[in-house]
From Swiss-Prot:
Species of provenance: Dichelobacter nodosus (strain VCS1703A)
Residues the entry annotates as binding Zn(2+): 887, 890, 907, 910
Subunit structure: Monomer.
Recorded family membership: Belongs to the class-I aminoacyl-tRNA synthetase family. IleS type 1 subfamily.
UniProt binding sites for L-isoleucyl-5'-AMP: 561
Protein name per the record: Isoleucine--tRNA ligase
Motif 'KMSKS' region, chain ranges: 602-606
PROSITE patterns: AA_TRNA_LIGASE_I
Chain positions recorded as ATP binding sites: 605
Cofactor: Zn(2+)
One Pfam family in the UniProt entry: Anticodon_1
Protein encoded by which gene: ileS
Role noted for this protein: Catalyzes the attachment of isoleucine to tRNA(Ile). As IleRS can inadvertently accommodate and process structurally similar amino acids such as valine, to avoid such errors it has two additional distinct tRNA(Ile)-dependent editing activities. One activity is designated as 'pretransfer' editing and involves the hydrolysis of activated Val-AMP. The other activity is designated 'posttransfer' editing and involves deacylation of mischarged Val-tRNA(Ile).
Amino acid sequence: MADYKHTLNLPQTDFPMRGNLAQREPEQLRWWQEHEIYRKQREAFADCPTFMLHDGPPYANGQIHVGHALNKTLKDIIIKSRHLLGYNSPYVPGWDCHGLPIEQKVEQKIGKPNQKVSATEFRAACRRYAAEQVALQKDGFMRLGIFGFWDQPYLTMNFETEAQIVRALRDIVAAGHVTQGFKPINWCFDCASSLAEAEVEYQDKTSYSIDVAFAVKDVAALAKIMHADVVPAAVDVVIWTTTPWTLPANVAVSIHPEFYYVLVEIEGWYCVVAEELIPALKSRWKKSADWRICGRALGKDLDRLTLRHPFIDRDVLLINGTHVTLDAGTGCVHTAPAHGVEDYDVCQQYGIDLIHCVLGNGLYNDDTPHFAGQHIFAAEPQIIELLQTQNRLIAVEKITHSYPHCWRHKTPTIYRATTQWFISMDKAGLRQKALDGLNEVAFTPDWGKPRLLNMIAHRPDWCISRQRYWGVPLCFVVDKQTGQLHPDIVNIMDKAASAIEQKGVEAWYELSLDTLLSGKEVDRYEKLNDVLDVWFDSGTTHYSVLKKRAELSYPADLYLEGSDQHRGWFHSSLLTASAITGKPPYKALLTHGFTVDEDGRKMSKSLGNVVDPNQVIKTLGADILRLWVASADYTAEVSLSPNILNQRADAYRRMRNTCRFLLANLHDFDPEKNSVAYEKLLPLDRYVIAVAHDLQEKIKKLYVSYDFHLIYQEIFNFCSVMLGGFYLDVIKDRQYTVAQNALARRSAQTAIFHIIEAMVRWLAPILSFTAEEIWRYLPGKREESVFLTKFYEGLQPLNDDFLSMHDWELLLQLREKVNAALEKARNQGIIGGSLEAMVVLHLPPQEYEIAARFEQELRFILIVSAVNVQPSAALSIEVQHAIGEKCERCWHYLPDVGTDHQHPTLCKRCIENVDGGGELRRFA
């Protein structure tokens, strides 16, 4: 028996079947670096329109985690896809380098500043630690295949950036947005510092819930106002609070001017509460006796009556406040302006001074009656006991409620009045500027817009000062007596910024006043050593980075971060840019969700469900992690687990093997010599090119709309269904059996070439390592790297008279029905493989016309040995065993096998392909 294997055009390629990504990817990284691909990309796209994605700086502390991997990979996918779309999209990665977490790490190593080491030594150690962390994270990000200016990142601790941060504050001061105030702000005892809104998170806390009686001083006046039917000997206004520790600071009780309040008698005791809350109070106070209403009045009529503090010799004013609600409590609100923003605001209206009795470490100061020197939380049981002793406690219980906690220490915070510097939301119209600007910003997903608008509309002034060591100094010079800024503060800050640009933040502490002021002013003024909130550092990178670096542009086209950044970087950037320019620093915001396990649980070491991206890279490779990112609907929580990663690895293998098969069928194809002109391509090949063309147009739109998970689905389905399940299966016969240079074979190779040229670009933003590997195996002259190209332009929509796209869809539907009939026949033992079959098709007019156009080549579309097409009113399919013997070369069952004595095991078609001029294929 002759061996005809040498007459077949079998696929062959050196492109590996297995990715072995963990081993190959580092080699690819080195190749990119050695060949300076990123620099060459910058040069290649320099004259293109720009697309500017500005990197929100991660904090320089610790190894990268899956949240980092998700965020950076999304950014990289966007930037690489924008290059394919013809944009110049430089990427400058950044790091947030100042702040408390770094201070804490350094304290653990060398001790607290001004105790074991000087403040100067401490700041230098912080700078070194931050640099080490940047280097660690940089290696992790680069290993993910992220392209960017890794040798020229921006760091908020770079001298030039620190100087620009001061200049940004200078401009905001000059615009009139900065104020000083003794106001209640979020305070953490463990940080010993104020906290920004973004540094506070809410967790459940168990607290005392108490109702406390405040005695009315002039009962007769109260009774008259309330038109009471009795003038009791004593009356109490009852408040409710979950912060008993704030009672020593109480100076007022607030009631709503438009709510009705009633004088109630309960078993001989008289009290005043909101009328609407009586049913709830009966239950909470457990007083089931008759509640007799003796008098009634609006809150505004009770304004400015005097009460007595329950355990301190102090008069307390009854005041009106519209912040009072009927959601809980008594309708009478305990008011301590040192410990609540609304309390502070309403007392300001009445000219009531606050009482400042809590120190920065959480202890009551020495002037606090009864509790001096005690920690506020530890003193609460004693406060409750004292209230009981004074017969002022009406009810007490413990409740669990949502309470602010420090995001770093996870410990409860308080509101505490301190002298701080603020960016005012309303003094110079900043709030309205920010709100107006947001209406011009595009949001993905769109629910981000009302969320951020609501935050801006209701946020307090921004406290920007911190009493820490490692940060950018405010560079304020103030009057020692009044605390007011020097009248020439803008020029002073200019001088300070110039010094910092040369020596870093240390320059501020080394600057003497006489270098900033004239001689006669030195004794009157002093420098402040407060540093800026780190959210101001990152929130001004639009000023210190985008506007400063020549390769970047302003405003940014896109900011992309996790959904928590509505209250963080998106927020602070909006406020600073609006304060400086009156407009947002970005045209669009995109947010992604947090990573959770496959059961939707937050990742934590205690649950054992943390996925380390570095470990994934070492085992599966970065491209699998990148594919996970692309496949996820990032607008919600993003699930990750070993099981999910294994599923993505399976999908990767499908796509890789599809590309390998395409490459293997191009082993002898030179696109310059062997390409077939479009009009000479077989209809099937024109069709698959059209499918790829339409898919590419869809993929372009999906990249623009950031719907990467849909791109993943489209490419995977194209590989699995259109190529693996149809086209590549159909053309195997043509590829393998016809003559090497036959038009039919070169036609298929031309289509394959166009498809892989397009597909490698579709994949490049997602599977960056694999796409570059594929690129090197493609035939023909080309750019050095896939990342130096744009989307492939060699695809065409369908443009012939043979079949329309709709006709092809009907044919594929018919093919599915034939496959189902073949499977049924296989199960019945009529046939084994599909090539053992002859199919008789009874087709309605439309399907009959389509099928008949293929004549005898329809069998290749259906992958059977024979087809008989008959017109019919209704569609039906018969499957019979094909007549004849199996051809040794093409495996078709045909009657003419054995009719040639020189090739007794071949069919006539194969004999023609081996010895003759080759078969003629016209359609498939």
